[in-house]
Regions:
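Short, low-complexity N-terminal intrinsically disordered segments enriched in polar/charged residues
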Residues: 16-67
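Short solvent-exposed beta->alpha transition segments
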Residues: 46, 56, 62-63, 67-109
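A short hydrophobic beta-strand element
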Residues: 107-120
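Zn2+-dependent metallopeptidase catalytic core
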Residues: 121-126, 137, 180-232, 263, ...
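Zinc-dependent metallopeptidase catalytic helix centered on the HExxH motif
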Residues: 239-312
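Pan-zinc metallopeptidase signature
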Residues: 324-397
């Protein structure tokens, strides 16, 4: 069963600042029945009879990419496709790919439909990990045509699969950009590395340390295309979950006119990676998912020193209901302000380590609000709600 869950992705312009919010898109891969004759078959899997030459070819090519063997990767590729495959090799190696695997899904000789699954450095690579689909024409053990698949995956097109990105390697962040944004790489990589220092602190709280973060810069055209074009005209950045394999971050730097805005958006989105990458968040926890990202993104400032104070309205509950579809700008602003102040209250009342332990137990371990509250704070969630609703009410205005 394929399950796609989305939340709002909007951008707010309040008090001269721009803040991106996450596009939380959780993708569960197709589960196949072992008795189903159309079942996906891993390339190189043990089968009865003589080895399949196409499976052997694809397995050898994937192995070459994983170990950084450019010659082995290009060996089965026709001359007309060598540049395309060389660019793809360089992109995936720049992203620190650690696992690559082909799965043949359909055969109509000489054409095969395949899925290329992949994982990057540090990721726990699950069987149902991220993947892209391709259509390959293979003649005499040579790939002569590579085309768009009949059924692309929900992630397609990924930022990297075109193979034309240029990369910068920061201390903590790998940043990829199309040639049109090459001139922004040095500036944004420096900002992202600085933001990552803050995000690393919260990843440690969450027990979700990241070997590296991945950040992609999009032009307006690519913004409407990457990851299926799920980003809206309102957003300037989003975190794209890759299931248990981690997450990517995409920003649209053309909509961010100041260094401060760039820093806040990147720090916010990497904050999502730090807190919820590798797990599936619940829609009802939107207040906490976005609230903690707001808290992280605004560091070292506290909520009352940000534009969110202007948008805060008197709360009725600590765990606010998720935004409704079609919410207007004022509703969006008030929701994110309340989430920010809610997390700020937890920090004010109990200290940052205990507040982040509550976040970890709720978002990563899926404890109930009451169980997470009792474990982290030593009191029930109703008491925490009363305390914070009162505190937040005094911050209004």
């Amino acid at each position: 069963m394929r399950d796609v869950t989305t939340t709002h992705d909007r951008v707010r312009h309040i008090g001269g600042f721009v803040l991106a919010v996450v596009v939380a898109i959780t993708v569960a891969s197709l589960v196949t029945d072992p008795d189903d004759p159309a079942q996906v078959i891993p390339a190189g899997a043990a089968v009865a009879g003589p080895p399949d030459p196409i499976e052997q070819l694809l397995t050898a090519q994937a192995t070459a990419l994983t170990r950084g063997d450019q010659t082995g990767w290009l060996k089965p590729v026709a001359p007309s496709l060598r540049k395309r495959y060389l660019d793809l090799f360089r992109s995936l190696r720049a992203l620190h790919v650690t696992t690559v695997d082909y799965r043949i899904t359909t055969r109509r000789q000489p054409t095969v439909q395949v899925e290329l699954s992949y994982c990057f450095v540090g990721a726990r690579c699950p069987k149902d990990g991220p993947k892209i689909a391709q259509k390959l024409t293979i003649k005499s053990n040579v790939i002569v045509v590579e085309a768009a698949a009949d059924r692309p995956t929900d992630l397609q097109p990924t930022p990297w699969e075109s193979g034309d990105l240029v990369f910068a390697q920061g201390k903590r962040v790998t940043v990829g950009a199309p040639p049109a944004l090459r001139s922004r790489l040095k500036e944004i990589t420096k900002i992202a590395d600085s933001a990552a220092v803050v995000d690393d602190r919260f990843a440690a709280y969450a027990g979700n340390r990241q070997p590296r973060y991945r950040l992609f810069l999009a032009t307006e055209k690519l913004w409407r295309s990457w990851y299926g074009g799920k980003a809206t005209n309102w957003a300037v950045g989003y975190m794209q979950p890759l299931g248990a394999a981690g997450a990517d971050v995409v920003i649209n730097p053309g909509r961010l006119t100041t260094t401060a805005a760039l820093r806040e958006v990147i720090q916010h989105e990497l904050g999502h990676v730090a807190t919820i990458a590798g797990v599936t968040s619940r829609h009802e926890d939107m207040w906490l998912v976005e609230g903690v990202a707001e808290y992280i993104g605004s560091q070292p400032r506290r909520a009352y020193d940000t534009y969110n104070r202007e948008a805060l309205t008197k709360p009725k509950a600590l765990a606010a209901r998720p935004l409704r579809d079609g919410a207007d700008d004022d509703e969006v602003a008030a929701f994110y302000a309340q989430g920010h102040f809610a997390v700020d209250c937890l920090v004010t009342a109990f200290g940052e380590p205990r507040a982040m332990e509550f976040v970890r137990q709720r978002l990563r371990l899926s404890l109930s609000l009451d169980d997470a509250s009792r474990s982290a704070f030593g009191t029930d969630f109703r008491h925490v709600t009363t305390t914070c609703v009162d505190w937040m009410s005094h911050q209004v205005g």
